[in-house]
Amino acid sequence: MPMQGAQRKLLGSLNSTPTATSNLGLAANHTGAPCLEVSIPDGLFLSLGLVSLVENVLVVAAIAKNRNLHSSMYCFICCLALSDLLVSGSNMLETAIILLLEAGTLATRASVVQQLHNTIDVLTCSSMLCSLCFLGAIAVDRYISIFYALRYHSIMTLPRAQRAIAAIWVASVLSSTLFITYYDHAAVLLCLVVFFLAMLVLMAVLYVHMLARACQHAQGIIRLHNRQLPAHKGFGLRGAATLTILLGIFFLCWGPFFLHLTLVVFCPQHLTCNCIFKNFKVFLTLIICNTIIDPLIYAFRSQELRRTLKEVLLCSWWPGCWAEGGGDSVWPGSCVTLRGPLPP
């Protein structure tokens, strides 16, 4: 489990992370050489998890409430929010349980603790896999919406999206169960690392291709209106910056965790690797940060979703407003029918 003095079963080959007395300090490795170790306070870890939990619950509630958002694209975004919710929730639950056990507040049998430990590990692993899968699914959906715009609604039908979502959840739960069961095999960790790299390559290829097509389209418009080329260059730079931010956040938040798994396989006893292992909780914190950032990138950019979210928040204080909107969108006349597969 990801706490001081405890560890995840998936990473059972690691030594327990020693307690650090400062937020940023130097810990000694086995030879006495200084080793940089960053300690994440439990309060900060739980606070970030709570922010992620609330944020993703709001996304799920907004999409579930507004029927205009019941398209394949928003189904993938909703499932991404749900998987991120489970990532943060499972880590918060695990952290809280360990704190209670260490404080002596929660007293139970070792067998019960082990069963709970295994269940939370499966939930955490499966939700992480789902989160990565739905990030890839959103990229594929947007790619189809751009390159097959005229056939998008016949390709990405809601039943097909629902079948894909069900397949992702089932495959993630089954594979995570196998991963936790055979956690001590190097092949398990390598499979996870390869899966992460595959998702990274998939997203990079699709988004780069989409950026290239967008630049070509912008260049065609510029030529049509006899404008100057610098405007096209500015568009390309903005698109490249957006793409860099999107992929950069994904890599920076998930990369350290999978680097950690890679080092577990190839240098479990190396002194430098042991220094990296001491910062395992930092890597988990980065993943929690990614679950906070995902709604900002994929959900809250949609004007329709933001409007529905405001209505959900208002109606949480004034329950009578649900009846005024007829059940679709809360306020009369606020429904905006989606007329295309454009991403939010």
Swiss-Prot record:
Keywords, comma-separated and alphabetical: Cell membrane, G-protein coupled receptor, Glycoprotein, Lipoprotein, Membrane, Palmitate, Receptor, Transducer, Transmembrane, Transmembrane helix
Please give the residue ranges for the topological domain Extracellular: 1-37, 94-118, 184-191, 267-279
- Has keyword Glycoprotein? yes
Q: Which InterPro entries match?
A: GPCR_Rhodpsn, GPCR_Rhodpsn_7TM, Melcrt_ACTH_rcpt, MSH_rcpt
Instruction: Report residues carrying sugar chains.
Output: 29
**Which GO BP terms sit in this record?**
adenylate cyclase-activating G protein-coupled receptor signaling pathway
Query: Sites of S-palmitoyl cysteine lipid linkage?
Result: 315
Q: Name one Pfam family in it.
A: 7tm_1
Topology of this chain in the membrane: Multi-pass membrane protein
Biological role stated in the UniProt entry: Receptor for MSH (alpha, beta and gamma) and ACTH. The activity of this receptor is mediated by G proteins which activate adenylate cyclase. Mediates melanogenesis, the production of eumelanin (black/brown) and phaeomelanin (red/yellow), via regulation of cAMP signaling in melanocytes.
Q: What is the name of this protein?
A: Melanocyte-stimulating hormone receptor
- Organism of this sequence: Cebuella pygmaea (Pygmy marmoset)
